[in-house]
Amino acid sequence: MLLMNLQLFAHKKGVGSSKNGRDSESKRLGTKCGDGQFVLAGNILVRQRGTKIHPGVNVGRGGDDTLYAKVDGIVKYERVGRSKKQASVYPVEIENVAE
């Protein structure tokens, strides 16, 4: 009887897949101004996809659902009902000190 000690090797070299190694740039979504923060008119409050947060008092909604302040004031994030959230900007009186 003939015994052969045989070791088989791979006939193709293992190579990393070219289907990996890509990723899209982050979109930098999220809140840009916190609750109670003073903002100027035109400042972006929230960048979002869809209306996770709805526009409230003195807040506008852009074409890409971005929320922005329409007046100078203080940002307030509020809950309306069980699940709806909204962002509002309430104007504040600023005293000008004449010197």
From Swiss-Prot:
Ribonucleoprotein keyword on record: yes
UniProt GO BP: translation
PROSITE patterns: RIBOSOMAL_L27
Acyltransferase in keyword set: no
NCBIfam families listed in its UniProt record: L27
Propeptide feature ranges: 1-9
Pfam families, per database record: Ribosomal_L27
InterPro entries: Ribosomal_bL27, Ribosomal_bL27_CS
Listed name of the protein: Large ribosomal subunit protein bL27
GO CC term (a single one): cytosolic large ribosomal subunit
Designated gene of the protein: rpmA
Entry PTM: The N-terminus is cleaved by ribosomal processing cysteine protease Prp.
Source organism, top-level taxon: Bacteria
Residues making up the signal peptide according to the UniProt record: none
